Amino acid sequence: FKGNYTGDGTEKTGVYFRHLLPETAGGSHPSFLIANTETLIPGTSTFFGSTAPPNAADHKVVFAGFDDELAPTLGGIYLAPLAPTPALTTLVSIGQRVPGDRTKAGFNALGEGIAFDGRFVGFWGAWGEESREIKLYCPAEGNRDRIAYCNKELLCEGADEPIGDPGSICDETGCFQLRDVPVNQGIFVHDTRTQRTHVLAKTGDEFDDFLFWNYAGKAPCTGTGPLG
């Protein structure tokens, strides 16, 4: 699992595991660290700036971690045994050549949601500088503070006037934000035995996108999550 916490006044995040027993609350086994923001990105002298929720199978775990979650220049997808502070094996990395791409481009974005069955790792990846603009309409369901902030209707305690996300645009259709998303993206599978990465599908004539983009802005004066 992924855990967020604050240490010495600094926000931190990490990937952990815990052995569960058929008892109340899963037993009393402690949780163990796999990697966190005090772990060096393999092959670099840079610490992880973010880690994503892991996926575990066959006593192994895979997860994505980057130096910068929003604009990664280092990091990738990693494999590790379910053991305390294990050695990490790099499966796919930022900058690695995209399989099957004639331009020899490298990945500049990798998805946090990863499928894993103990051998094969499925993931989303993007590359290139080309982008297209989409509208992200403010959510109608979910956290009420986040909804209010997106719609410029959030009233903080002690304030006289409501505030809103400066990135929101409101018209007769409602409030929304404009987001640039990558044109070049695809779904890939990495074989941990052969160490080869294969393409399943790419954007082009048949597909425009492989992700559902949504607004997840952090609302100030509340305890909601980070911008995503």
Language-model regions: role of each:
Residues F1-G228:
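Conserved "turn/edge" positions that cap or connect secondary-structure elements
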